Regions:
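Ferredoxin-reductase
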Residues: 2-88, 181-182
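Short, conserved loop/helix-junction motifs that constitute active-site signature segments
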Residues: 135-143, 167-171
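Histidine-anchored nucleotide/phosphate-binding helix
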Residues: 123-139
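Ser/Thr-glycine-rich phosphate-binding loops at phosphate-binding pockets of nucleotides
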Residues: 117-123
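Reductase modules of NAD(P)H-dependent flavoproteins
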Residues: 2-7, 147-193
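Short, surface-exposed secondary-structure boundary micro-motifs
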Residues: 44, 95-96
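A structural signal for isolated positions on well-ordered beta-strands in alpha/beta enzyme cores
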Residues: 66, 91, 113, 147-149, ...
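A short, basic/flexible loop-to-alpha-helix module at the beginning of a structural domain
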Residues: 96-107
């Protein structure tokens, strides 16, 4: 491994659907990031390394990094990541990047509309987890409201729906709506269309 990369051990995997899954990795104690940033993951393919940027789902307060993936069958990297299980290692760059972060320390009250589809929810989950902890500890007043709209074709593609709805019930500063464009594929769907 070179000085820009290291191997991160996968500690957990959860499949949400046949082509959607999350993994948690142990990044070691030196990996630092801000909610909304991404990490670059990679794997070897045909003798060379393939890398892609993935938004971090977890909060900086969590000891592990969580990622949410959608399998792209003809893709360069997700088919390789799809095969990985707990105990396997994934190549990761040592430094998080990205400026898609949320500012809550300003005096003015800025509200945020967070719009995403399926795996695009990842940085928003990181925001909400981080602000939820800050709010419980009195570090975030909740003056800035967050409104999350997450869309998908099928209801089972909402990997973080239950968690986000549970937080929304506990706080005055966060609301979420999940909407499916093909609700007829799940007779139990009671959400938005």
């Amino acid at each position: 491994m070179d000085d820009k990369h290291y191997l991160a051990r996968i500690t957990k995997r959860l499949d949400f659907a046949s082509d959607l899954w999350m993994i948690r990795v142990n990044p070691g104690p030196d990996f630092k990031f801000t909610a909304g940033q991404y990490a670059t993951l990679g794997a070897e393919r045909d003798g060379h390394r393939v890398e892609r940027a993935y938004s971090i789902v977890s909060s900086p307060y969590e000891p592990e990094l969580e990622f949410f993936f959608e399998l792209v069958p003809e893709g360069q990297l997700t088919p390789l990541l799809y095969k990985l299980q707990p105990g396997d290692d994934v190549v990761m760059r040592k430094v998080a990047k990205g400026r898609f972060t949320i500012e809550t320390s300003r005096v003015e009250h800025t509200h945020h509309l967070l719009v995403s589809t399926v795996t695009g929810i990842a940085p928003y989950v990181s925001y909400v987890r981080t602000l939820f902890k800050d709010w419980k500890e009195g570090k975030f007043t909740g003056d800035q409201k967050l409104f999350l709209l997450n869309g998908a074709s099928r209801p089972w593609e909402f990997g973080y729906r239950e968690e986000m709805e549970a937080i929304a019930k506990q706080v005055p500063w966060f609301r979420c709506i999940f909407t499916a464009s093909r609700p007829w594929e799940d007779e139990t769907w009671k959400g938005e269309v």
